[in-house]
Regions:
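Gly/Ser/Thr/Pro-rich low-complexity, intrinsically disordered segments
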Residues: 1-127
Length: 127
C-alpha cells in the first residue's frame, strides 16, 4: 500500500520510485478486479481491515465483522468473496484490495463508526 508524492494511492507488489510512504501488508485480496485465490494454513475467522482502490483511484477502507461480534469475521481465505458481495451491494467495483490487519489488535475510527481494539495496538494509520 503506497502513497506517492503526486498524491496517488497504489496497492501493488512492485516498488514505486516516487513513494512518499508505504505499508507492508497482505495478502492481496483483489488484483485487476479479479478475486485472488487464497490458501491459508490455520485460517481463523477474524475481523478484517482492508484497503481498496476503485477504478477511479478512490481509496476506500473497509472493516468486516460478524453479526455476532465486532471481533469475529470471515476466514481470510473467504475475504475476497466477501468483498465481491460488498461491492455488489454498494454498486462499487474494486480494482485492487489488500488485507491490512484484523483480529483483536485492530481498530477503526471515523466520525460515524468506532470499532475499538480488544488488545492494545501499537500504532494508528490516520487518513
Amino acid at each position: 500500500f503506497i502513497y506517492s508524492k503526486d498524491n496517488q494511492f497504489s496497492i501493488t507488489t512492485t516498488p514505486i520510485a516516487n513513494a512518499d510512504f508505504g505499508l507492508q501488508s497482505g495478502p492481496l485480496l483483489i488484483k485487476d478486479q479479479a478475486l485472488m485465490p487464497l490458501k491459508i494454513i490455520n485460517d481463523e475467522g477474524r475481523r478484517r481491515v482492508i484497503a481498496t482502490l476503485t477504478p477511479q483511484n478512490q481509496l476506500i477502507f473497509i472493516t468486516i465483522v460478524s453479526k455476532d461480534s465486532e471481533f469475529n469475521g470471515p476466514l481470510l481465505a473467504e475475504t475476497p468473496q466477501v468483498l465481491e458481495i460488498i461491492g455488489q451491494k454498494i454498486n462499487q467495483d474494486f480494482d485492487v484490495a489488500i488485507n491490512l490487519d484484523g483480529g483483536s489488535a485492530s481498530a477503526f475510527y471515523t466520525p460515524q463508526t468506532y470499532i475499538k481494539e480488544f488488545s492494545p495496538i501499537g500504532s494508528y494509520f490516520c487518513y
